[in-house]
A protein has these predicted regions:
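Hydrophobic alpha-helical scaffolding
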Residues: 62, 157, 200, 236-240
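Residues embedded in well-ordered beta-strands within globular domains across many folds
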Residues: 60-62, 103, 180-183, 211
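A contiguous active-site-proximal alpha/beta segment in oxidoreductase catalytic domains
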Residues: 124-126, 131-209
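Glycine- and other small-residue-rich loops at beta-strand/loop junctions that grip anionic moieties
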Residues: 39, 104, 130, 156, ...
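N-terminal glycine-/serine-/threonine-rich beta1-alpha1-beta2 phosphate-ribose binding loop
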Residues: 2-127, 136-151
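Active-site-proximal cap/loop segments of hydrolase catalytic domains
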Residues: 61, 76, 138, 164, ...
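Active-site/binding-pocket entry motifs
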Residues: 67, 188, 216-217
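Rossmann-like dinucleotide-binding domain that binds NAD(P)(H)
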Residues: 208-212, 216-240
Length: 240
């Protein structure tokens, strides 16, 4: 992806493209849902969980860090006796007509681009929270899902939990009367990530693809993997 393409320009273009919507996909020969998992920090756990479902086949595990991709492939192999393909570019998943859905657990700045491209490729999507890096991207994702008739689900586990659904339903039913205001607080005890220092990009990391549509910045030793959360180019802090 060209370093001269801004994330707004990239997403605006992909959201506006009108491709012929696929109204259905042929079932896989095994009658299983064939998926590819992108982003293998949180995605490693998701791949393990999905692989153990009797009606799911993990065909690809994808990460720009080749070591993580290989490790996750070994994990799935150990769980079900069949290794998925370990790849570095998620677009290979989208190009495969046998794949039904993309599971996107990549950093936040990739959620919208990957989801939109997957919808355009005729894939359904499960995307980790937050669904997008900013509200505008969320609108583009909704448009892509509707245009291409794809199912897109955001994995907000607490929102989908039975207990919280019951609580919200009771609020809507007026159990405590009209709600005028609410307050929420979130505290997490975290150590400092330091200021970081310029470093050579590890051979096993495709840092160019990791940055994707985000502004280009030099590689630092305190960002990849998890600490990208604390930089606005890629994350949303404690909010996301």
């Amino acid at each position: 992806m060209s370093s001269t393409v801004s994330r707004r320009r990239f997403l605006g273009t992909t959201a506006a493209v009108s491709l012929a919507a696929s109204t259905g996909q042929a079932a896989a020969p095994s009658d299983k849902i064939v998926i590819g998992v992108m982003g293998l920090s949180r995605g490693r756990s998701l791949a393990d969980s999905f692989a153990k479902k009797p009606n799911v086949e993990i065909k690809y595990v994808c990460d720009v860090d080749s070591q993580r991709a290989a490790s996750c492939a070994d994990l799935v192999m150990g769980a079900v006796g069949k290794a998925p393909q370990a790849i570095g570019d998620f677009r290979r998943i989208l190009d495969d007509p046998d794949v039904d859905a993309l599971v996107c657990a990549a950093p936040n700045h990739w959620h919208a681009p990957a989801t939109i491209l997957a919808c355009q490729a005729g894939k359904h999507v499960y995307v980790e929270k937050p669904c997008s890096h900013n509200p505008q991207e969320g609108e583009w994702m909704v448009k892509a899902a509707r245009t291409h008739n794809r199912a897109v689900q955001m994995g907000s586990q607490r929102r989908s939990g039975e207990t919280l659904q019951k609580a919200i339903r009771m609020l809507h039913e007026g159990v405590i009367g009209r709600v005028y205001s609410s307050r929420a607080h979130y505290y997490s005890l975290r150590g400092s990530i330091g200021t970081g220092a310029p470093a050579m990009v590890p051979e096993h990391l495709d840092y160019e693809l990791w940055q994707g549509p985000a502004p280009r910045t030099p590689y630092m030793d305190n960002r990849v993997h998890y600490n990208w959360h604390w930089f606005w180019h890629w994350g949303n802090g404690e909010l996301g």
